[in-house]
């Protein structure tokens, strides 16, 4: 139907612009509502603008320029990438994952508050969800800060003794957001 097709078009443009509006199915679920609200707020558009044709002009402009505002991951590889994010909250670092970043796409994860620093880890996966390897080394993007993750969906605030608790100790990169209006981490084949 026309309403579902229109919403699927909005979802698709949001995803291209770096917003997390998956799945692209024309159904207005919680993730789609949050992505639309965030887009409208960041672009300083009225809440009812989504019902107007002008929203498509704004979405197309955002899709052409995903660097607009906020933090985004962009995938320049031929593989899907699974990414996880860390941020400071009430004196500790909270890690959350996994975000799927399709080849050639960008995702703007939802950040709480206005952090000056985030922590990022990602790995390329094959069609079965297994980590892509180059020889014996995973095709991944991280750093040196060890934080806990798990294989399935997670949100964790305690990063002591990851292995003893059945979690993975994962090396995150520290990303300084500073006062920049936009920060993009690009995943490239190494």
Give residue spans per PLM region.
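Cell-envelope/ECM-targeting effectors and their regulatory/trafficking segments
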Residues: 1-190
């Amino acid at each position: 139907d026309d309403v579902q097709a229109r919403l699927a078009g909005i979802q698709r443009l949001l995803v291209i612009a770096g917003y997390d509006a998956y799945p692209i199915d024309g159904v207005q679920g919680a993730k789609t509502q949050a992505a639309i609200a965030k887009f409208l707020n960041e672009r300083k558009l009225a809440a009812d603008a989504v019902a107007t044709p002008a929203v498509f002009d704004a979405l197309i402009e955002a899709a052409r320029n995903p660097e607009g505002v906020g933090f985004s991951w962009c995938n320049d590889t031929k593989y899907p990438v699974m990414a996880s994010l860390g941020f400071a909250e009430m004196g500790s670092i909270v890690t959350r994952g996994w975000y799927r970043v399709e080849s050639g796409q960008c995702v703007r994860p939802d950040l709480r508050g206005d952090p000056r620093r985030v922590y990022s880890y990602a790995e390329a996966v094959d069609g079965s969800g297994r980590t892509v390897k180059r020889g014996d080394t995973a095709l991944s993007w991280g750093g040196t800060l060890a934080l806990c993750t798990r294989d399935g969906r997670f949100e964790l605030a305690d990063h002591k003794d990851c292995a003893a608790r059945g979690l993975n100790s994962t090396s995150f990169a520290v990303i300084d957001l500073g006062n920049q209006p936009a920060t993009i981490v690009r995943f490239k084949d190494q």
